[in-house]
């Protein structure tokens, strides 16, 4: 990502991965070590914390089973978040108010330890956030592009 695509490191999660950016946003992608390659979640930026809450509550009104994790605030990027399952069952994040890095030379990446790599406040993440329930199926190739 850094050499081939020109991403810059914003912060590291000790022993697990790195927050990378290709814009002024604190991070555009988080790359983590895992037994197989997979997409953990997509994220959708909204205007402010009120929109994070309204969007999540609207979805949860008819589908409370889609709640994953939130409302909270990440330490890395300082953005507000709420994670939900989209209609296909994939993790999606509503977020707002992410830090920006307007000048690369003024930014020094930090190494975040433990839960600091995940969040500053809010409820703790559920086990399925840290180890997706379908990870075993991914590892044996049970998921495929053809369904």
Language model segments and positions:
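Active-site beta-strand termini and strand-to-loop segments that position acidic
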Residues: 20-24, 34, 85-87
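Vicinal oxygen chelate
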Residues: 44-147
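Short, charged/polar, Gly/Pro-enriched secondary-structure boundary elements
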Residues: 26-30, 90
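A short, sequence-level motif marking secondary-structure junctions
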Residues: 34-36, 99
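His-enriched metal-coordination microenvironments in redox/metal-binding proteins
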Residues: 27, 36, 74
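Short amphipathic alpha-helical segments
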Residues: 38-42
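Short beta-strand
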Residues: 10-13, 32-33, 73
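Core segments of cupin and vicinal oxygen chelate
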Residues: 1-27
